[in-house]
Each structure stands twice: as C-alpha cells, then as structure tokens.
Amino acid sequence: MTESQFLAWIRSALRSKSLRWKPRTDALELARRPYKGDNKRQKFEYQCAICQRWFKATDVVVDHYPKAAGSILKLEDVGEFCNNLYCEVDNLRILCSDDHDIYTLQQKNPGMTFEEARFEKMLIALMKDKKKVLALLQDHGYNCKNDVQRREALTKILKEK
C-alpha cells in the first residue's frame, strides 16, 4: 500500500465515522421541521441555509462552514483534518445538494462569486447535451466548430437573457 492509498484509507474511515458525530446530528435537527405533505414515508424536511427552501433528507448535505474539513496530503495533516472534521455545530450548516455543488465549485475557483459559480454550473450541465446546445446555437445564428467556440457562444446567449 502506498502512502497515498494509506492516507485515502484514513480519510475515508474518518469521514465515515463523522456521520455519527453528535454535533453533525444536532445541525441536522436544528434545520428540520415535521413534513406535512402527501408522502407518508417522509417524516421530516430540512431547510437549505442558502436558498431557504425545504428538502427531504436525501437531498441535503452537511457542509463545514466557514472552514472546510480539508484533506490529508501527508501524515502531519491528520490532526488538523480531524480538528476541522469533528467540529461543533457553529461550524456546520445544511445545504441542498445543488447549492452545495455550486458552493464547492466557488471554493475551487478563488475570486468566483456564488452567482458566477451558479452560472458556470448551469453552463456545464447544458454543455453535456450536445444536441440541445447545437440546436440552441443554430437558432441564434451561431455555427461553431468545437466545444470552446460552442461554450463561448452559449455564454454570450445566456448572458443576454
């Protein structure tokens, strides 16, 4: 086993144990309310800290905020990772999956605002459906030869709206 594999194994074990960490459970309880809809199998719903909408448990994640848990790149990082991962409720918030993906993209690109990350995420999702993109570009009079040109043209079209 290489050092990288060992550290990945340690990180995985620590993350799986953190799912039962009491402050994490408390954060979920603080963001929940009884569900009053038609689904008899759903008991609670959880409020996203960003969009303020309500979601079922499978559609939310517990996010470390404002300080992320980080990663383990060398053995010396384990202590700091544990301190960040096993934190108190005030360093945790509940986010819907979509907002968490957008927030993660924003964190990976310093200087990018949340709205820019939301736009980028929408653009990435659109670019995956090539037929839809080509039809949209053709409707707007664009004839693009590659993905880079399609992406630039699509960005122009969407920013005009």
Which stretches of residues belong to each language-model region?
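Short, charged surface segments at domain edges that flank catalytic/cofactor-binding sites
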Residues: 1-52, 81-90
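Intrinsic-disorder-associated interaction segments
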Residues: 1-3, 7-8, 12, 16, ...
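Short alpha-helical interface elements
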Residues: 49, 73-76, 117-124
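Histidine-centered nuclease catalytic patch
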Residues: 53-91, 107-110
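A detector for short metal-coordination/catalytic motifs
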Residues: 89-161
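The −1 position to Zn-ligating cysteines in a subset of zinc-ribbon hairpins
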Residues: 47, 61, 95
